[in-house]
Amino acid sequence: RNFAIGAADDQAKRAYDVLYRATEAGLAVARPGATCCDLFAAMRAVIATFDPGTGEVGRLGHGLGMQLTEWPSHAPFDNTVLRENMVITLEPSLGYGDGMIMVHEENIVVGDGPPRLLSARAPRDLPIIG
């Protein structure tokens, strides 16, 4: 989860908004029959609205199981087909400001219909503490 302490500048708020919307795009695609590269493309399209050059990462999520990071990878090269009951992460990220990076993560179970979140969804707006 992401939080700002005291205050958040406009760039941080915008980065958080883009990553929240990228996660929403991933949630909309995460259904049986979709591929990991479909997930990547959906999230990456939203990240590109922030800055077309940002988000050049190897992947935007992965499988979750006995290891912290497992197959499959949500990347343009992974054609793994999602199946019901797969447990995966959605992890869109982007660089912003002067060397800053923000990563948003939701862990989900792929289901017949909307995926099931394994924890409460992150707040819509960047939480500010203090």
Predicted segments, located by residue:
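Active-site neighborhoods and metal-handling regions in enzymes and metal-associated proteins
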Residues: 1-130
